[in-house]
Amino acid sequence: MRRLTLALDAMGGDFGPAVTVPAALQALVSYPQLELLLVGNPAAIHSLLVKTDSVLLERLTVIPAESVITSDAKPSQAIRASRGTSMRVALELIRDGRAQACVSAGNTGALMGLAKLVLKPLDGIERPALMVVLPHKKQGKTVVLDLGANVACDGAMLAQFAVMGSVMAEHIVGVTNPRVALLNIGEEETKGLDPIQHAAVLLRDVQSINYIGYLEANELLTGKTDVLVCDGFVGNVTLKTMEGVIRVFLSLLKSSGESGRQGWLMQWVKRWMKRRLMRQFGQLNPDQYNGACLIGLRGTVIKSHGAANQRAFTAAIEQAMQAVERQIPERIAARLDAVLPKSD
């Protein structure tokens, strides 16, 4: 069994080691091939490992880091003062060959900038993108990018995202010849901002991309496309809106009461419908697909939600493992070399 070594930014996110350390231990229990490097304040980390089985501790190493980048820090300032922070040290472990991937729930802008600085983008990629795999109503999955790494994108960047998304759909989701669409305000060719229309022109000329045109946001979970491409501003707003609606819906299902004045048959029908709806919509629970992959780099970086709980952060660790096992950076590099001109 091939060993996998991941670096975890143990101090990042809203809850820091209180979430990342238990999630790390949960992952070690589930995956015997996994080794973890926990980066952060040794005292804070070790205090949560006191009762840990010594067998698990053999696959866990604490890497000291002097400080942490806070969630409210401006990315430019955070990057300038990043030496010795848990986020930067975790990324440097990939660069130095000690880890195969990094998982962080820290400041998104800082992670984006530091990852680009430390790991460097692949040839042919201007800027990496945040990507997530979302379930849809046809029991399949859709790759969506960018989700906030790049607020503004030109047409060439969107085309690069499409190529990377296609690779993810093939090797993570398992789709042959994945359909690619651009998120837009309408399906007509005349609709949309100039960068979207420019990207459409570029994608029509890439024979290895199965470009199907524009898709509106209300089709996000319908399964009409395997890859959905947009700029980071639109993608982030779309994802956060969807997550908020789903969380409210699930909470309403959980809290729906049953009137004692109803007959037993009606109560049974309501309970049956509630369980069925929970099963169907439970797969859309954001905790189950937590972890956006920052793709387009010479290494694997997973961005977890800052507010992730233990279950959600464990899901992000599993995403990192999958990306390493499927050799995603190498496959993206090979595809880019074949279909896109290299940037100057």
Swiss-Prot record:
Domain of life assignment: Bacteria
Alphabetical list of Gene3D superfamilies matching this protein: Isopropylmalate Dehydrogenase
A GO biological-process term: phospholipid biosynthetic process
Gene: plsX
Name of this chain's protein: Phosphate acyltransferase
Function according to Swiss-Prot or TrEMBL: Catalyzes the reversible formation of acyl-phosphate (acyl-PO(4)) from acyl-[acyl-carrier-protein] (acyl-ACP). This enzyme utilizes acyl-ACP as fatty acyl donor, but not acyl-CoA.
Keyword Nucleotidyltransferase: no
Lineage start: Bacteria, Pseudomonadati, Pseudomonadota, Gammaproteobacteria, Enterobacterales
Main location: cytoplasm
UniProt organism field: Sodalis glossinidius (strain morsitans)
